[in-house]
């Protein structure tokens, strides 16, 4: 442990003590069985008091078992263009065929219209047979990567360069949580855990990395995650097993990226920050679309059972929700269309599929492919329902 890391450990412990008891880990290993949705950990208010999970009204008769289409839809995060949610998205939500919605700048640019859109989506969910709130999410990393105006205004690099970086990270996480919660959102696709290897490389170019030392990155992202979690917003740590060595311009959104990191480097650097951030309350882990030959030379991480099941679930011990990066990414061009990509990711062990092409039809195609794969046995029912159960447990603890 470097002197700087020892210093950050002390700062982190001090910050957590000042904020009260840290939240129960949302995705870390536990000796007990995974909780049912009704028993999932609750979110917290800004004061740290428990927020009870949303529960359904008493029903006169048992709720019918979900259809294959509903189970499949609950694994999809939809997106849409512009300020107004389209009718087909509202219908999917109302019929229990949606897991969540991701928002981009074209959705949020008009605050009044965005507030109306969130109300519409929440009202549609209240009419749904699914008892839990939608996962309403965006990328609010800080600095140059923000979909909502306001906090956190500091980038990850600026946080790491602060006089008290752990305190700055906690303030950034709290600011992100309050900002999203005020807008009616309950999931942040942040913080970034990538440990950058060279100044100006892909992840450092927009100041998205908290540092070059994995111990520092683990401490700072843990502080960010814990503070955000206390505001009632679930954190997503990304991009497993790490994009820190990607050179400038190596963007998986645009095309294939292969990172030839040795296995020891992947584990001692790229994956090293994850246990601390998961223990601090991260409810989701996003998989990278890069290829890592040390783990799987044939498939991007998010399509690789080796990466998802053996590294993340097995070695790291993560039991929460796994989420894909953008399903429309250029790095997946060789892996078929939307439906084929969705089934391949689900087969690898990814729970939640991010259909972020600003087109509801993309999510509907992915859901249809999942439902067909469930019906014909391509995807095993036990694994499929386990993924839905993890998503429902996450939703049950949010507002």
Locations of regions flagged by a protein language model:
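Sec-dependent bacterial lipoprotein signal peptides
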Residues: 1-17
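N-terminal low-complexity, Pro/Thr-rich disordered segments
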Residues: 19-69, 78
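DNA-contacting surface of Y-family translesion DNA polymerases
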Residues: 59-116, 129, 143-146
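Second-shell residues forming the walls of enzyme active-site clefts
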Residues: 68, 109-130, 216-379
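Hydrophobic faces of well-ordered beta-strands that scaffold small-molecule active sites
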Residues: 73-80, 99-103, 134-140, 187-191, ...
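Short, acidic/polar
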Residues: 82-94, 169-179, 267-274, 336-344
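Glycine-rich, aromatic-flanked loop segments that form ligand/cofactor-binding clefts
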Residues: 122-152, 172-196, 217-242
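Mid-to-C-terminal alpha-helical segments outside catalytic/metal-binding sites
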Residues: 372, 376-399
